[in-house]
Amino acid sequence: MAESSDMQELFVQATYEEILKLASSVNHEQIRETISSSSPQKILTGTMLTLGALLTTLIVKKKGTKFLTTKVQSNVAYLAEMVVWKANQTVKTICDEVLHQRKVIEKLQCLDKMCSEIEKLRYDMEHFQGMDVTKELIQMCEQKMIDIDSKVKEVERSCDRRIRDYDWKIATLTAHPTQQLPAHIDIINQHIEDDAETQIIQQHMNKQARVKLNSRNRL
């Protein structure tokens, strides 16, 4: 039993020393190359085994962190950063593969190209032959409004002239009536008198006829 315990202690001591030796001797360049060229599965497995073994030996040896020198701490921190970087790269690669399979990247590139062409077309339209089209359009609209105002004023002046002309004609007709008007009125009055006499004669004749008819009925 004692021999088994000695073997375990020897193994732990060897593992602990090997891990510390590796952590102390490796540099950032080696860590970066190893992480960059290794698969995510291998990196995750190796990292977990290394950190697990180091933690186990520290607990068993009960030596705490006093053996973690500045270089070891720097390497451990850099290793963690590289693991995170590798994870980000792996996720990006997976996303790129999925997007490529669905041809999303090509569509996005096509949209970017179309947007660029539209922007170029808009610029060309706004600066046709070196002119600022927007400014030119505004000036044209302003000039057109001025022309419309001028036409409206001309129409107003023409209407005023026509109104004054009609007013003058009406005033002239009112101030100088025709000389034939009294004669025309006399003729109308004569017709009225003739109609009245005719009606009186007709009424008298009708009365005489009724008298004769009544006389016959009595006989």
From Swiss-Prot:
The chain crosses the membrane at residues 48-74. The keyword Transport applies. The keyword Lyase does not apply. Residues 1-47 are lumenal. One of its GO terms (cellular component) is host caveola. It is a single-pass type III membrane protein. It comes from the Viruses. Residues 75-219 are cytoplasmic. It is found in: Host rough endoplasmic reticulum membrane; Host membrane, Host caveola; Secreted. Its main location: host cell. GO terms for biological process: monoatomic ion transmembrane transport; symbiont-mediated activation of host autophagy; viral process. Homotetramer. Interacts with the immature particle in the viroplasm. Interacts with host CAV1, early and late in infection. Interacts with host integrin ITGA1/ITGB1 heterodimer. Interacts with host integrin ITGA2/ITGB1 heterodimer. Interaction with microtubules blocks trafficking to the Golgi apparatus. This is Non-structural glycoprotein 4. It comes from Rotavirus B (isolate RVB/Human/China/ADRV/1982).
